[in-house]
């Protein structure tokens, strides 16, 4: 409803100037690694009863992505866990199918910290931007392997891999 009202008022992506600019739509898919609320594809290694806390069911995330694309807005989503990132990628794929011609929108994942090899490959294939937050490395690198296990930790924080694969990765 809020997005529809915003659009009815005449606001559009790219409007504005130096101090005010209408940018992409940003949502959250999960929480944080430290609080064990980042959504993982497997149980937390140090808390097997937890897999994270998804913010939206997949159907809702798909709807929000398609709604963004219909409005001409890039869809960017906070996703720290690998399952959250996969969910965002599923939503982007859904929106691009539902709203043809929107592949040029600069959809993205904010954080993109815990990733599997499959997730990295999908990001590269879809050309989704990554808004990395390297400031969290100082804390997360001390807990990453304990939280997600050695195998998943090895393919996480793989921003250089994404850069080498042609993905636009920014710090911020």
Language-model segments: which ranges?
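Catalytic beta/alpha-barrel core
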Residues: 76-80, 107-113
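Short helix-capping segments at alpha-helix termini
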Residues: 14-15, 95-104
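Short, electropositive alpha-helical surface patch
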Residues: 83-98
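Short, surface-exposed connector motifs at secondary-structure boundaries
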Residues: 67-76, 100-106, 166-170
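Active-site-adjacent C-terminal substructures of enzyme catalytic domains
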Residues: 114-172
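Short, hinge-like loop/turn segments at secondary-structure boundaries
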Residues: 10-12, 93-96, 127, 147-150
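Metal-coordinating catalytic core of metallo-dependent amide/deamination hydrolases
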Residues: 1-82, 86, 122-129, 134-135
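Glycine-rich tight-turn/loop motif centered on a GG-T
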Residues: 41-57, 108, 143-155
